[in-house]
Amino acid sequence: MSRQVSLDRLRNIGIMAHIDAGKTTTTERILFYTGRTHKLGETHEGAATMDFMVQEQERGITIQSAATTCSWKDHRINIIDTPGHVDFTVEVERSLRVLDGAVAVFCAKGGVEPQSETVWRQADKYGVPRLAYVNKMDTIGADFFRVIRMMEERLGARPVPIQIPIGAEDTFRGVVDLVRNVAIMYYDDLGKDIREEPIPEDMRELVEQYRTRMIEAATEADDALMEKYLMGEELTVEEIKRGLRKLTVECKINPVCCGSSYKNKGVQPLLDAIVDYLPSPLDIPPVQGTDPETGEPAERKADDNEPFSALAFKVVSDPYVGKLCFFRVYSGQLKSGSYVLNATKGKRERIGRLVRMHANHREEVEVVETGDIAAAVGLKDTGTGDTLCTDAAPVILESMEFPEPVIQLAVEPKTKADQDKLSTALLKLAEEDPTFRMFTDPETGQTIIAGMGELHLEIIVDRLQREFKVGVNVGKPQVSYRETVRGRVENVEGRFVRQSGGRGQYGHVVINLEPAEPGSGFIFENKIVGGVIPKEFIGPVEQGIKEALQNGVLAGYPMIDVKVELVFGSYHEVDSSEAAFKIAGSMALKAAAQKAQPVLLEPYMRVEVTVPEEYMGDVIGDLNARRGRIEGMEARGNAQVIRAQVPLAEMFGYATDLRSRTQGRGVYSMQFDHYEEVPPNVAKPIIEKAQGKA
């Protein structure tokens, strides 16, 4: 079967940017000009084709990366629109993993904004070639050349403009195509009346300067071009494009275009640049993986005749077809109705139907080929990051890394009916989003949800109520405290005696209690000599002590890191029983803990904050105010990484706080490190609240 579109004419690209740089509008325009939509969708009207979740249309931001396919000049372009909010970086991570190239959209006024830095670093990590598009050239304060400077300074990029704007703000009329050396003028706001004209006189000098710079960059691609240029010969348009394309694919330069998507200016030249400079699946190195049977490295080339391999990068619950699994085909072909092996989980799966997505419309297809991005219906066990392949040639492709969730809160169903729906809904959401976790708190029995930030959890709760119709009450984020003792006490007794007619109860133990090494939990030592307590009653004593440790004497939190020695006791021939000794053990522990200087412990987190140098003092001061201890600092690129230990109780709301302190340019990660004593002034209100005094 011959391919519909040859591999060299396929482009898998992502569109990435800061919030409000206009990337969803840009995608909308691309779809309009490539004939996929017949009506322009405006983000601010809540009608954008790519933003199809209710939450996205209300907030005017993109949360889930929607995938869509379109055609331009005999090329097929698969586009993934990615969110620009820091709480959703996982969506960006996973789309970058399966793309071959990307378009970074910058706002002509805001330039390189904080999220642009984060997204750019993620693209660097995956080695994704990209071109830049400076949007909103018609807004007040638009400055194309300032954005170019910011790309160099903040991103360490090497931008090479292939267009420069004609006019700016309300006089923005078109662009100069530096490669073909012509002016493209727009005479209306619908992008219908477009004319090619000679370059305006007053811009000749500027155009010459930037064109020379672009041609010099192109000649670095190969010696033949360099030689021709140095001999003073003119390079042809084809040669310039070939040179720029080679360097872009190698991630050495970033061609830059400009326009105003909203006013329909500059979108067609951007499409031309996507086709001209971004890589096809043939331009990128073969994908690497491992053979699950031998553990040896394996690779798959982009070729329809190679064995089938694909990476699942997103799972969504669709109200009509159930579970939709998005995947990128790296090699071979796949027909609908066939069986595949999920090599990551070692399970065979049947592909029910194959669909190519256009935002939220689907088009059923019989077969998908190398380089395609499509979705499958019917994969029950496949999750994000799993590899799909043939039984005959299994391979596990490199998966994705997802950060651990850093914030958690309790959710409770409002009614009994909600109770049953809650866990099903949460499981579905956890399947879609690898950075969202849910678990039951063993101490309170509450359902806890954890995620990447407050906005992330807010949207999860919102989706529970809207999509899954589950009513929930949301608690405040909580901390799990612990208790321990600081002093040693000896010969504390626990005596449980009931002897008033009939079979009595008799248990009597004497214990010593002392602090144990941090992290050791609970140590029990039997020092009974001469059989004062028979062997069969020793186990129940230990059991009773363990149960008593679950509820500490200060505030009812579990006690950890204590050592108990059982030193003496007595028993009664008839009345002693396992139950009596269990109760005696727990009574002894409670009495001993009261006397052994009990203290409250809190979880300390290992926190890493990455911030631009100018905010460092402010951020360190703030961490100190949060009872944090700074452990060290190091430079990473043009940012500083601060490492600190901070109590979890002080970290609530930190994401929002850091964002405002650093104008959104700071990012942080944290994970649990150890438990440590709570200072008396902080512990007092916690203990009083637990004892019901507060």
UniProtKB/Swiss-Prot annotation:
Tell me the segments the record calls region Disordered: 284-303
Q: Which domain of life is it from?
A: Bacteria
| An example molecular function term from Gene Ontology annotations | GTP binding
Enumerate the transmembrane spans. none
UniProt keywords (A-Z) are: Cytoplasm, Elongation factor, GTP-binding, Nucleotide-binding, Protein biosynthesis
The subcellular localization recorded is:
Cytoplasm
Nucleotide-binding keyword on record: yes
**Pfam families per the record?**
EFG_C, EFG_III, EFG_IV, GTP_EFTU, GTP_EFTU_D2
Which terms under GO biological process does the entry name?
ribosome disassembly
Residue ranges occupied by any tr-type G domain in the UniProt entry: 8-282
SMART domains reported in the protein's UniProt record: EFG_C, EFG_IV
Chief location category = cytoplasm
Q: Could you tell me which Gene3D superfamilies the record lists for this protein?
A: 3.30.230.10, 3.30.70.240, Elongation Factor G (Translational Gtpase), domain 3, P-loop containing nucleotide triphosphate hydrolases, Translation factors
Please tell me one Gene Ontology term that the record gives under cellular component: cytoplasm
Q: Where does GTP bind?
A: 17-24, 81-85, 135-138
InterPro entries attached to this UniProt entry: EFG_II, EFG_III, EFG_III/V, EFG_IV, EFG_V, EFG_V-like, EFTu-like_2, G_TR_CS
Q: Which family does it belong to?
A: Belongs to the TRAFAC class translation factor GTPase superfamily. Classic translation factor GTPase family. EF-G/EF-2 subfamily.
Family matches, as NCBIfam families: EF-G, PRK12740.1-3, PRK12740.1-5, small_GTP
**Listed name of the protein:** Elongation factor G
Organism, by scientific name, is: Symbiobacterium thermophilum (strain DSM 24528 / JCM 14929 / IAM 14863 / T)
